[in-house]
Design a protein with these regions (language model features):
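Short beta-strand/loop motif that positions the catalytic acidic residue
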Residues: 198-200, 206-208
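Sec/Tat signal peptide C-region and signal peptidase I cleavage site
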Residues: 16-22
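Alpha/beta-hydrolase active-site loop
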Residues: 71-91
């Protein structure tokens, strides 16, 4: 009992250092394309590091997961993030960070353009670039076919369409309307467009692996278009696309601590 009293007194006096604000921050973290959110997934080490630091974390399975393969459009994905935010607030989170890896990072940016009140956005190895040749040229025929289906009133008809993930290709089953939404080279998933449209006053952390193709595009591709903020940070770490969340874990924890 005496030891408990001493500890409480020390806490009250500020002698014992604890991350008092950590539990106030809730983080929605979104997995990459064809991925999942479990402990052994590419984002697992990062979400675990966030929890260890005292943050409340929600890492939902999203419409682009291995098992779902674009079963909802972009607005539907944002609604699922809304649900995750609600869960975090129900657990006591007062400030909300939205982040992700690869396509998850892309959608975190889209969310930041359409929702108010975020405390920050974290993107690690941002990916899915439908405006660039690596995706645009590969999906061109299927995109044109899907767009014609939409024009012909068959937008809700499901079919097989090609998808690309870091050079790997596979067919996905999706409705024509949803496929067009995700693959549109002039649409919402164009990263530079999202960054330029982020809400002022929301800081952005961008972390990319040196071996990732995105790193070669540099800050000018998208990051430099973000609204100015003293906490904006662009970090290049070791590694490539898939292992960026693991390598970024301490960078993200430190950045959140500084907010």
């Amino acid at each position: 009992m005496k030891r408990i009293f001493v500890l409480l007194a020390a806490l009250a006096a500020g002698i014992v250092s604890v991350p008092a604000h950590a539990a106030d921050i809730g983080v929605v973290f979104l997995h990459g394309k064809w991925g999942m959110s479990g402990p052994k997934s590419p984002i697992g080490p990062l979400t675990q590091a966030l929890e260890k630091a005292g943050h409340i974390v929600d890492a939902p399975e999203m419409p682009w997961s291995r098992g779902r393969a674009y079963d909802r459009d972009i607005e539907g994905a944002l609604a699922e993030i809304d649900a995750a935010v609600k869960r975090l607030k129900g657990k006591g989170a007062q400030r909300i960070i939205v982040g992700g890896q690869s396509l998850g990072a892309n959608v975190a940016l889209i969310y930041g353009t359409r929702r108010d009140g975020l405390a920050g956005i974290v993107v690690t190895a941002p990916g899915h670039t439908p405006e660039l040749a690596a995706i645009k040229d590969v999906v061109a025929a299927d995109f044109a076919r899907a767009r014609k289906m939409v024009t012909d009133g068959k937008g809700d008809v499901k079919d097989k369409f090609i998808d690309v993930n870091q050079g790997r290709q596979q067919q996905v089953g999706a409705t024509a309307r949803v496929y067009v939404d995700w693959m549109n080279p002039d649409g919402a998933a164009v990263i530079p467009k999202s960054v330029a449209a982020l809400k002022p006053g929301v800081p952005l952390l961008w972390v990319v692996g040196a071996e990732d193709a995105m790193a070669k595009r540099g800050e000018g591709y998208a990051f430099a278009k973000a609204p100015a903020h003293p906490k904006n940070a662009y970090k290049v770490i070791g590694g490539g696309h898939a292992d960026a969340p693991t390598g970024a874990a301490q960078e993200v924890v430190a950045w959140l601590k500084g907010l």
